[in-house]
């Protein structure tokens, strides 16, 4: 990686970027390396194990841990991350049937299952704008989640995994779909 702390310390001591030099990396201090990956941290909620605990997420600490997922696209890392949190989910889509009695309420009040309520809303035809209005989540993230839901429709056109063309399968993998989801 890029030795950020080293460069910051040298700059604080009065060195200019061209004085800092190579620092043992192929790039000089004033040329940051290209980063072709993303990382997401997702809290792990296990609220079902605690009797009487309100499922609504607020300022009090209810997380029992977290996961980190690394990949080349947001869609990939969110799907991988949701598989790792230990709720028995297969990713953002393709999960066991979750029933949300009042989907609008589930979207507007953050809970441990809110991300899956977003998936359900997108599958039911909610617009990104409507979900943004209810959740206050930035549309950039919602559009990325919509990409996943939209691609399930592309995959669903094929009866077996063997029928899926290589380019469609490659895109599904780029979007973080597991073999189970496909």
Enumerate the language-model features and the residues they cover.
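ATP-dependent carboxylate activation and anion-phosphoryl transfer catalytic cores
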Residues: 1-167, 172-176
